[in-house]
Curated annotation (Swiss-Prot):
Domain Toprim: 255-336
GO terms for biological process, alphabetical: DNA replication, synthesis of primer
Alphabetized GO MF terms: DNA binding; DNA-directed RNA polymerase activity; zinc ion binding
EC primary class: transferase
EC number(s) stated in the UniProt entry for this protein: 2.7.7.101
Protein name, as recorded: DNA primase
Protein's gene: dnaG
Zinc finger (CHC2-type): 41-65
Family per record: Belongs to the DnaG primase family.
Cofactor dependence: Zn(2+); Mg(2+)
Cofactor info, note text: Binds 1 zinc ion per monomer. Binds two Mg(2+) per subunit.
Organism: Clostridium acetobutylicum (strain ATCC 824 / DSM 792 / JCM 1419 / IAM 19013 / LMG 5710 / NBRC 13948 / NRRL B-527 / VKM B-1787 / 2291 / W)
InterPro entries: DNA_helicase_N/primase_C, DNA_primase_core_N_sf, DNA_primase_DnaB-bd, DNA_primase_DnaG, DNA_primase_Znf_CHC2, DnaG_bac, DNAG_N, DnaG_primase
Amino acid sequence: MECLIIAEDIIQKVKDLNDIVDIVSEKVKLKRTGRNYSGLCPFHHEKTPSFSVSQDKQIYKCFGCGEAGNVITFVMKTKNFSFVEAVKYLADKVNITIDDNKDKYYAKNKEKYDKLYSMNVEAARYFFRNLDSNSKAKKYFLDRGINQKTMRRFGLGYAKDDWRQLLSFMKSKGYTELELIEAGLIVQKNKAVYDRFRNRVIFPVFDYKGKVIGFGGRVLDDSKPKYLNSPETKIFKKGTNLYGLNFAVKNNIGDTIIIVEGYMDCISLHQYGINNVVASLGTALTKDQAKLLKRYASKVVISYDADTAGQAATLRGFDILREAGFDIKIIKIPDGKDPDEFVRKNGKEAFMRLVENAVSIIDYRINRAFENVNLKDSESVIKYVKDISEIIEELDPVEKDVYIKKISDKTGIREQAIYDLISTDIQKSGNNIEKMNKNSNYGQNLYVESAHVKSERYLLRLMIEHKDIRSYIESKISADDLIMESHKKIYNIILNFEDNLSSDLKSKFGFIESRCDDGESSSEIVKIEEQNIMLSENNVKDLVDDFITNIKKFRLEESKKKIMSEIKGLEEKGLFDETIELIKRMEEIQNQLDNL
């Protein structure tokens, strides 16, 4: 968890001494084309170079996928570093020393973070010692095949069935109730304070560096909730960590990671010597987890539970991992077992065979859909073919041929009929707004920005450059009204411009960049800096109003699409009465669109 801010002049010095052409060339083979350099984009698959690097401006831009940024952004995105990590990496290259403890440019709250880590370590030791004194808790792990060595390695423990045991212990170590509340170890309710975890086996949660950042606890009886996790704290953010990654990193995991759902799945596989395993801890893999994973691997094998929730999570996880650029395969475990059960019953070699035979997402979706098909029921077969046609219509011609033959073999429907169905679907979807439009002159895809994205950038550029216009924009639109999360962050940073901040643009953009701690925001601020807006005294407010209208229009159209989808789902189930309120809502949205 980064808690540091580096001064703008240090950041600028790091950028000045690291030529972007040199840094990009470590990853991309560049060729000089006029004043710029070009190569194959590292952020998306392409055969014709659309990635351009400007040595004069010290920025890069891909005309195929829209990625853009400076030398720091490039390091953040290609290495999945945070902003501070990227600056430190580049600083090391040019022998600039940045001292975590003494540098005056860092925020002064490191001591508070260190105390949170110390409290968690102390609590983890306490829980671990408790395990030996409670036979029921220890039996829980032993019954699941977890040996003493693994219990010690993962720091597994037990929280006693007592309201204030941990509280008393931690206070004896010198920690205050307020500090323990901030760490999420105790709860305050109706002026009373008590232990958060009681009568539960405990799983310490580590970050990728091996620091204890939180805990998960499972009940030993039928009480609810079955699992209880630490709340979010300054060092523990849900959806930004992967359980077991610290162990996986230590074991030379290679280029492939296996993702499972829960603590026990991860722990069991590690015990059986399968070390390239992490757990997403819940059914929803996040973009932040995918970014963290990208530092260590380019291939992912998903092994979620076989139940409905697990299958749904597999599909959601696939979309996020695909967006992050992973090569993805999916395991189907026989008999509906989870990874923990399977490896305990069948051993390491059997599980590794499942990994070797993992299938692509297309095969997974086709096979999953086929499970519910009744080949004797014509309607069931037709629905299956239509559903699958939507899945494969975006594949390249060779892949499409392969899957059409598979579907034809499964269903007995002629290949030509399936081709015709896909062609019809593609024609119907031709009216949809596409991000990628075909450039007939060059035979490559060019990225087309949406109107609302451009409008948000223009508004932010105006806010940065013109203080008087900033006030007008603030009165018309807030950060929450913006669509892109990175733009919301930049909007709020602009509102916090310091009074003594220089009025020149370079200082303002430097101030913002030093506070953009993620790749998307860092990339966006470079794009905003590149925007040029022609202004006259007469058209400023009209321009701003037009930009805001574009944003509102997009949000309303997205709401309309969502409601239309809900109406369609209800109608397919025959629930026509339930659609009445939704139809009224859609009419209201349409009226708002008409009045924009």
